[in-house]
UniProtKB/Swiss-Prot annotation:
Its EC number is 6.3.2.8. Cell wall formation. It holds the Pfam family Mur_ligase_C. Keywords: ATP-binding, Cell cycle, Cell division, Cell shape, Cell wall biogenesis/degradation, Cytoplasm, Ligase, Nucleotide-binding, Peptidoglycan synthesis. Pathway: Cell wall biogenesis; peptidoglycan biosynthesis. Belongs to the MurCDEF family. This is UDP-N-acetylmuramate--L-alanine ligase. The keyword Kinase does not apply. It comes from Parasynechococcus marenigrum (strain WH8102). ATP binds at G121, S122, H123, G124, K125, T126, T127. HAMAP family: MurC (MF_00046). The gene is murC. It is found in: Cytoplasm.
Length: 467
């Protein structure tokens, strides 16, 4: 059972500008809660929050809490895992005896308030929850949405809908998703990651089992071997076979810019649809979203038109612009499996001659920023294998995400291993983002697809190129 959230109780977010925190703040302010927050950065998100009525201060000091207390407010104070116990705001809030909620406590409370779909899994959570939200919006359901990315049809990561359903992204990185009790839990896949939190794959599997145990119903991807072995859902979906599964979306034609597929329920064909997204992984994400909507009783006929409107969230194969004849694409891929799938999709655009760009790209220049020293060390061989699938490769320095450096773990180490596996691949390692930008300028060619991947600040490449 989640912690009770009283109507119109004031709430203060430490780090309100984060993608997960800002989504919650938008929901609460729309529902009448006095909402405030702090974030040291001045960003478009903080400006948007202020326009919605959230009080935002751009510092994190004890004075922020003192001001709230002097105004007679004793807010619930919300923190994420990223906020250290040494944070001065958090220390003062504890000293004042204020209620301290983890972000997951607040999300759990909102999930409990209405029929909810919680989307979990190692990869594809944001895309699948975005596609689920889009299908429900296009079907006239107007769901509440709390997503870890910008949903194109909403222009936001948080939406306080007026329909009966809530769609939430359930992040497994810190294990807090076990607090959620949704009506439907959707699990996209499972693979070892977040080794800074989990002791190993078994630990991660046990956490996902606990999440599944807390759901009224579970929908899972049968194409994932780990889920197939360790999870017992109420329903399966697949994109490889319609046999033995409750839902399937089988590809009839895969192109560099779209996919024609046939949807099945209990082995029987229901209808064909055109998915305006390339890649088998995107078809799987869409199949999971379709299956979830069907389990919530939405007729396929009301969903099929929405399929043509599907767009991925921000930073998921996101065309930022064209620079001197090069297509600059930003993607959040930061795990070897994500990198492998994203590069395969990009190569399909090059080889098939079909792409979402004005003309098909002729070469693939991959740019990768490793995320966390611990992840780079754990998956060095897998990254080296995945990153070979390009015509030229540029590596940015490891984005630490607050971690201390590890001896011998750096982008040059990764480059050396890739070169051993593929000696003829052109590779360069940048010293910083400015150097990376210069390398893109000098090593790319007209009609190149420049694909920047990573969960850090590598998305700063496009502003530097276009400046």
């Amino acid at each position: 059972m989640s912690r009770p959230l009283e109507r119109q109780h004031p709430v203060h977010f430490i780090g309100v500008g984060g993608i997960g925190m800002s989504a919650l703040a938008k929901i609460l302010v729309d529902r009448g809660h006095p909402v405030s927050g702090s974030d040291p950065r001045v960003t478009p998100t903080s400006h948007q929050l202020m326009q919605l009525g959230v009080t935002v201060v751009h510092e994190q000091t004890e004075a922020t809490i003192e001001t709230l207390l002097s105004n007679g407010r004793r807010p619930i104070v919300v923190v994420s895992t990223a906020i250290p116990t040494s944070n001065p705001e958090l220390r003062r809030a504890r000293d004042a005896g204020l209620e301290i909620w983890h972000r997951s406590d607040l999300l759990a409370a909102l999930i409990d308030q209405q029929a909810s779909i919680a989307v979990a899994g190692s990869h594809g959570k944001t895309t699948t929850s975005t596609l689920t939200t889009t299908l429900l919006m296009e079907a006239g359901e107007d769901p509440t949405a709390i997503i870890g990315g910008i949903v194109p049809c909403l222009g936001s990561n948080g939406h306080a809908g007026h329909g009966r359903l809530l769609v939430a992204e359930a992040d497994e990185s810190d294990g807090s998703l076990v607090k959620f009790r949704p009506q439907l839990g959707l699990i996209t896949n499972l693979e070892l990651d977040h080794t800074d939190h989990y002791d190993g794959l078994d630990d991660l599997i046990n956490t996902m089992r606990l999440f599944a145990d807390g759901c009224d119903q579970v929908l899972a991807n049968r194409d994932c071997p780990i889920l197939k072995e360790h999870i017992q859902p109420d329903a399966w979906w697949s994109v490889t076979s319609a046999n033995g599964v409750d839902f399937a979306a089988l590809p009839l034609q895969l192109d560099g810019d779209r996919c024609l597929a046939r949807f099945y329920e209990n082995g029987a064909p229901v209808g064909d649809f055109m998915l305006p997204l390339p890649g088998l992984h995107n078809l799987s994400n869409a199949a999971g979203a379709l299956a979830a909507c069907r389990m919530e009783g939405i007729p396929f006929e009301r969903l099929v038109n929405g399929l043509t409107a599907l767009k991925p969230p921000g930073r998921r194969f996101d065309l930022r612009g064209t620079w001197e004849g090069r297509y600059i694409v930003d993607d959040y891929a930061h795990h070897p499996s994500e990198v492998k799938a994203t590069l395969a999709m990009a190569q399909l655009m090059v080889s098939s001659g079909r792409s979402p760009f004005p003309s098909p790209p002729q070469r693939l220049l991959a740019v990768f920023q490793p995320h966390r020293f611990s992840r780079t060390q754990e998956f060095l061989e897998s990254f080296a294998s995945a990153l070979q699938n390009c015509d030229s490769l540029l590596l940015a320095p490891v984005y630490s995400a607050g971690e201390e450096p590890l001896k011998g773990v750096c982008s040059q180490t990764l480059a050396d291993r890739i070169q051993e596996l593929k000696p003829d691949l052109e590779i360069a390692v940048a010293d910083n983002l400015d150097h990376l930008t210069q390398l893109v300028r000098t090593r790319s060619q007209r009609e190149d697809l420049v694909l920047a991947m990573g969960a850090g600040d590598v998305n700063g490449l496009w502003p530097r190129l276009s400046a």
